Amino acid sequence: MHRPPLAAVLVVAAALLTGCASGDDWSQRRPSPSAVGALGAGFTAPGRSPAPESTLTPSPGSWSGVRPSPGFRVVLLSAGGDRPAKTLAKAVKEWAKDADVDLRTVTASGDADLLPAVTRAMEMHPDLIVSAGNDLIDPLTTVSPSHLAQEFLVVGAELAEPTENVTAVDWSGASFRGEGLGMSSTYDPASFTDARCAAAIRAGAAAVLTGHTGIVVWLDEF
C-alpha cells in the first residue's frame, strides 16, 4: 500500500492545526474593533449625543450603514424557551453571519444557571455580550455595574438603571425591566417579529459600535 511521505503528512497536519487555532482562539491579540460606515440622518439629534440612561428614537433604517470591523467578537447569551427569546436568538445569529461576526453562544440551562451563564460569557472576554431573554435581566443587573469594561447589549428588554456599559433596544410590547418592576408598555410576545428582532440587533449594535452606550434605543418604527 502506498503511503505519503512523513514530511507531507506533517505539513498537512500543521496546516490544519494552524487553521483551527486562528479561527477559534480568542486569546490572540488583534486590532481593537471599530465601526465600519456611518450612522444615517436621524439616528441621533443633530449635534447632540444622547445623555446616559436616556431613550433614543432613531429614524427607521438610520443604523443600516454601520457594521463591525472584521473579527468582531460577540457572545450570544440566551435563556428561556419562549418564542420571543428564540426569535431574538435567531436574529442575532443571522446578523452575525451577515456581518461576518465571530459569534459564540452561551445558553443558561435553567434558573440556577442564569448567573453562572453570565459569568461564563464574561470569561470569554468578547467585544460584546448580546442578551436575549427576560430571565437574564436580573442577573445582568447584579453583574454589569461591577464589570464596566465589558459591553452588554440587551435586546427586547432593558435594565432599570443601566450603567454606561449596558445598552438596550426596546419597543412597545418589549420593555421588561426585572422582576417586580413596572414596564413602560404592556408586554406583548407577538411584538417579537422576525423583522423587528432583526432590526433591533442591527440598531443596537450600531449604537454600541459608534459609542452611544448606556442608553435605550426605542424601536417602535423600523
Residue positions per predicted region:
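An alpha-beta-alpha
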Residues: 181-222
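Ser/Thr/Gly-rich flexible loops in soluble cytosolic domains mediating phosphotransfer, phosphorylation
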Residues: 150-197
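Bacterial signal peptide processing site
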Residues: 20-24
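Sec-dependent bacterial lipoprotein signal peptides
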Residues: 1-18
